């Protein structure tokens, strides 16, 4: 489908507006990825180059999918977490099939993604678990034993990203894990 010349600038403006509405940490992380891609290309490091290209493609697809909603570093952390989980599943499959060469490649990619994930200014899994435990302990002392849906109802979801320094999905999973552990 061909686009008329008047529509092209509007699409470019929307993409720039979305990216400028993103958090500074998100913008810095993308710039760092692009800079590392250039370095990997110059160093002819194929593993790093393909991994970074994969990251950038996944991020771009997420930007396209979430059209009008600007992404932030929490969304980037969720993307990285999903990619690390995919690598872990691939490693398990390759180990079952005796493909040690592919296991090593996937492990290198996973370590690289984890390094980028660690550079993001978000709460670690340990910090989230401690915060979730404290939150549940406080709820039990004030309201008694509550079922998980009522625990979720006590969370201030509009401000959870800033309060907990994590994405709502990460907070939800940390609370569920802490609830399961305490039950």
From Swiss-Prot:
UniProt keywords, alphabetically: Mitochondrion, Transit peptide
A Gene Ontology term for the protein's cellular component: mitochondrion
Cysteine disulfide links: none
GO molecular function: carbon-nitrogen ligase activity, with glutamine as amido-N-donor
Subcellular location: Mitochondrion
Superkingdom of source: Eukaryota
Chain segment of the transit peptide: 1-20
Signal peptide, first to last residue: none
Chief location: mitochondrion
Record-stated family: Belongs to the AIM41 family.
Protein name listed in UniProt: Altered inheritance of mitochondria protein 41, mitochondrial
């Amino acid at each position: 489908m061909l686009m008329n010349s008047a529509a092209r600038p509007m699409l470019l403006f929307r993409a720039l507006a979305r990216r400028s509405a993103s958090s500074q940490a998100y913008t810095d992380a993308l710039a760092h990825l692009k800079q590392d891609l250039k370095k990997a290309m110059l160093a002819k490091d194929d593993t790093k180059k393909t991994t970074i290209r994969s990251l950038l493609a996944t991020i771009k697809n997420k930007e396209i999918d979430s059209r009008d909603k600007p992404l932030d570093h929490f969304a980037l952390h969720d993307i990285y977490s999903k990619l690390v989980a995919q690598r872990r599943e691939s490693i398990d499959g390759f180990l079952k099939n005796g493909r040690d060469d592919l296991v090593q490649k996937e492990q290198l990619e996973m370590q690289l993604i984890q390094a980028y994930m660690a550079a993001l200014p978000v709460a670690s899994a340990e910090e989230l678990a401690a915060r979730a435990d404290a939150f549940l302990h406080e709820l039990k002392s004030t309201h008694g034993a509550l079922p998980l849906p009522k625990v979720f109802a006590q969370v201030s979801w509009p401000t959870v990203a800033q309060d907990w320094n994590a994405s709502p999905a990460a907070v939800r999973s940390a609370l569920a894990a802490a609830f399961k552990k305490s039950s």
